[in-house]
């Protein structure tokens, strides 16, 4: 007998709950109820500059007003940064990441200068400027005090993955994994020791989430999350994704 499905609603307390948040919460709660599953509430508060305690208090009050219930305790990402650090360390050890010293201005300039910059669903992709730096070059720039982010080397991730990996989306059916769809995404920054892509993947795995509901705007992010999950968190399999329109 299979265990009950586990779903999560994971808002960021960067402002008051808006209608889209409320709809997403109600949708996820309804799916969990219909499937006889569990609903988790996770506070995604890794952006310490924008997230505020008063917004979290208001968010919880609004969810209570909507009549929603969830499993306890509530997981707050800011309290579990070590989990993300451990996941990132493992990816680093497996040579699936690299430091990127480019500023946003430099990236935009390189994209503008390229004859045919690679594009993904959300626009131009990072051109890979720092991907092929030597170890000595990277070490020298670090020792020189240059700020850097950590990016996923999606080409290496693709080679690590078995061909034909997929997941099921309830709206669009079987989805074949494309590890390079979003390019070399940022997994951690100097000011925030993780990123949305890394934190959400790690937390879903640790919390045993089996079904994910998300908006159309995040549909293609599933490729990034499955890439990180399959290469690092191989034991965790999310059954399916449901798009909340």
Question: Which residue ranges define each predicted feature?
Answer:
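Hydrophobic alpha-helical segments, chiefly the membrane-spanning helices
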Residues: 243-245
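Active-site cores that bind ATP or allylic diphosphates and position pyrophosphate for catalysis
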Residues: 106-234, 240
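N-terminal Rossmann-like or analogous alpha/beta NTP/dinucleotide-binding catalytic cores
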Residues: 1-119, 205, 216-217, 221-234
């Amino acid at each position: 007998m299979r265990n009950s499905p586990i779903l999560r609603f994971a808002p960021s307390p960067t402002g008051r709950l808006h209608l889209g948040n409320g709809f997403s919460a109600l949708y996820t709660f309804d799916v969990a109820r219909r499937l006889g599953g569990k609903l988790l509430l996770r506070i995604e508060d890794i952006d310490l500059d924008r997230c505020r305690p008063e917004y979290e208090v208001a968010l919880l009050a609004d969810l209570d007003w909507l009549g929603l219930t969830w499993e306890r305790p509530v997981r707050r990402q800011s309290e579990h940064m070590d989990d993300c650090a451990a996941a990132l360390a493992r990816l680093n050890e497996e040579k699936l990441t690299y430091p990127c010293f480019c500023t946003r201005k430099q990236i935009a300039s390189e994209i503008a200068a390229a004859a045919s910059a690679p594009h993904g669903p959300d626009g131009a992709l990072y051109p890979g400027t720092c991907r092929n730096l030597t170890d000595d070059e990277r070490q020298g720039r670090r020792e020189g005090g240059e700020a850097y982010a950590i990016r996923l080397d999606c080409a290496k991730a693709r080679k690590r993955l078995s061909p034909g990996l997929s997941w099921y989306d309830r709206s669009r059916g079987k989805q074949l994994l494309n590890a390079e769809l979003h390019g070399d995404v940022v997994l951690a920054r100097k000011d925030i020791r993780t990123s949305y892509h890394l934190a959400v993947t790690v937390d879903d795995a640790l919390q045993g989430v089996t079904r994910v509901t998300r908006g159309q705007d995040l549909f293609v992010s599933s490729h990034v999350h499955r890439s990180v999950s399959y290469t690092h968190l191989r034991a965790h399999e999310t059954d399916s994704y449901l798009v909340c329109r």
